[in-house]
Amino acid sequence: MRIRYGWELALAALLVIEIVAFGAINPRMLDLNMLLFSTSDFICIGIVALPLTMVIVSGGIDISFGSTIGLCAIALGLLFQSGVPMPLAILLTLLLGALCGLINAGLIIYTKVNPLVITLGTLYLFAGSALLLSGMAGATGYEGIGGFPMAFTDFANLDVLGLPVPLIIFLICLLVFWLWLHKTHAGRNVFLIGQSPRVALYSAIPVNRTLCALYAMTGLASAVAAVLLVSYFGSARSDLGASFLMPAITAVVLGGANIYGGSGSIIGTAIAVLLVGYLQQGLQMAGVPNQVSSALSGALLIVVVVGRSVSLHRQQIKEWLARRANNPLP
């Protein structure tokens, strides 16, 4: 617990240092309004990264969420184009996202195949389905479906009490997932499943039901992100979530989640989302090409994984030495 809070404080300090450093290069980075409203460019990554944290804590992984976003976006456009009222179209899109998550969970549970392999397969399945629906809508390739009502396209660009709507939705998701993972019995079950699935099963923990809930929440969050992105850009495209995979997983791991399961932090992930998002924006404002920005995000992920692995092994060695000191061999 102490280590987790220490890591979160370190991330928060690093976030402040990052903003100040980029502010020295470009003073616009120090403008509060710019910092708040620029989150709309990347905060949907955070909306997906929060439930993804819980999936990884449980010992699983889901790399299909980017394709789920694209599929849900195209489905929303196709529903609207077919004359379905916008509120109903949004509801059906959210249900589709949850269904995609349940498909992942069902395949993982009943085939016992590694979640990485399953979600790699569904990544291509959902991406192909999105392109198929795009063709049905007459939007060839990565062309978008437009013509949405102004009330919908304005939604993601509104602000309430000085906060952009996407950021408000992210904060609501943050509160809900933090309470669920860290303050409920069901959340404790997620940690136990990640630490030892076999022990959790023998302890009468509903492992399969919990996994279904986690993957469904990730799919639902992907659908929420899709709706916000379509509203923000005013266009439904099958590639809307294509660039989400690397920054989302980087944020989860940087936030303190063990990639093998058993530990993680919703607050840590939230701070890491801002850290990664502002890193990319700061580099762009400094004139750094997007390719270099992506490479730095990948390098950051590698450094964090290696650093946490070294830290974990050092802690294990210290504990082993302490046990040896307290119980010397005869």
Where are these regions (language model features)?
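Helix-loop-helix "hairpin" substructures at the membrane interface of multi-pass membrane proteins
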Residues: P85-T93, L99-N104, I108, D159-A236
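Inter-helical junctions in multi-pass inner-membrane proteins, predominant
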Residues: I25-F37, L131-A137, A156, L181-G187, ...
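Transmembrane alpha-helical segments in multi-pass inner-membrane proteins
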Residues: Y215, S222, Y232-G298
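Short loop segments and helix-boundary regions at transmembrane helix junctions
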Residues: M1-I3, S58-I61, L99-G144, W180-H185, ...
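Cytosolic-side transmembrane-helix boundaries in multi-pass membrane proteins
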Residues: M1-V20, Q195, Y202-R209, L283-P330
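Single transmembrane alpha-helix segments in multi-pass membrane proteins
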Residues: E18-S82, L107-V113, V252, G256-I266, ...
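Membrane-interfacial amphipathic/re-entrant helices at transmembrane-helix boundaries
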Residues: M1-A49, G83-L88, D159, I205, ...
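Transmembrane helix-bundle core of multi-pass membrane transporters
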Residues: P115-K183, T210-A213, Y232-G241, V292, ...
